[in-house]
Amino acid sequence: MITTINNKHKKLNVPNLRFPEFSGEWEEYRIEDITENISSGKSKCHSLNGKYNLYGSTGIIGKTDEPCYDGDLVLVARVGANAGFLQIINELCGITDNTLIIKPKNVDTQYIYYFLQYYNLNRLVFGSGQPLITGGMLKRVKVSLGTNKEQKKVATFLSLLDERIATQNKIIEDLKKLKCAIIENVLNSNHCTTLQLGDVGSYIRGLTYSSNDVVEDNGTLVMRSNNIVNGSPLDYKGDVVSVNKQISQEQQLQNGDIVICMANGSSALVGKSSFYDGECQSPITVGAFCGIYRSKMPITKWLFQTNRYRRYIWNSLQGGNGAIANLNGEDILRMQFPIPDKQIAERCTKLLSSIDSLIESNISLCSKFSLQKEYLLRQMFI
């Protein structure tokens, strides 16, 4: 059981949310006062047949024969786009030099790990070119501590929530694998006819607009690459652009449309697709770097989630010499897929729709757990 303390107008050094068996103020320290050392990793040897894990800034990157580190450690990504990323480990291992190592003393290591999540190390990152966090910065960070017993209970509580989030993510991944297996099984059955996407649908180009067309509200929503969540519903609620520009009836998104990223500076993003659920209350279309595939056959929605589709995209992008990787409408319309007969297609559509609904409900639940964790981090630390 957790009790809430109204500390809004008090100056006691205690968290807002605390287990009831603990009392007394917390003491403030610098990280350097509660650690044996903070230093960069020194492991350099990769070995294909190494016995020990070699950790980089965001996880295991290989193996090594020379374990240089042991014990409870918190790892912090030191440089690059992932600067500030946290890991917690306890094993014989190697650690590379793009990672800072925190070895606490007389303090619960998990507690420090969760405190740094609460603290948000991104606030320390500096450098316009290559983002960087230094050991000196970490040493000066101030942390308030209760007793070791209280630290342990807070850390254990939050780790249980992390385990629940990990379990939820595993459920989501397993459902996605099940969906993919069903799709591949159906397309490889003997009840299919091979057709081009152009035989059962059409391609619509996105809207071209300029910065002068952008308005704050009461315009047409324009979906871009960042709104496409691969294999999931189109995200038309976050980070959207609204323009004061007329669109054709054909360009207005319709329920069941597939929105495709057709061009991007990153080739890995080209070809990703989302489906539109038809529930946006505003006029809505896609930008010039995206396209719309429209078909009256519901099962085509899942063709864009197959390995065959990904292979088509990969092959279409080979040989390009432009700065921006891109597809064209004909690339989409020429793609060939085995299409099951009407009766099987209807059964598959119902089954796959049910799995999609289950995936979305589990994603929603996982998001709620993550929000709960964010709230607890804000309330259980100072």
Predicted features and spans:
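Short, solvent-exposed loop/turn positions at domain surfaces
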Residues: G127, Y209, Q246-I247, N321, ...
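A short glycine-rich beta-alpha junction/loop motif
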Residues: K11, P15, G94-N98, G129-K149, ...
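A short beta-sheet element
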Residues: G56-Q117, F126-G129, T134-L138, R224-S225, ...
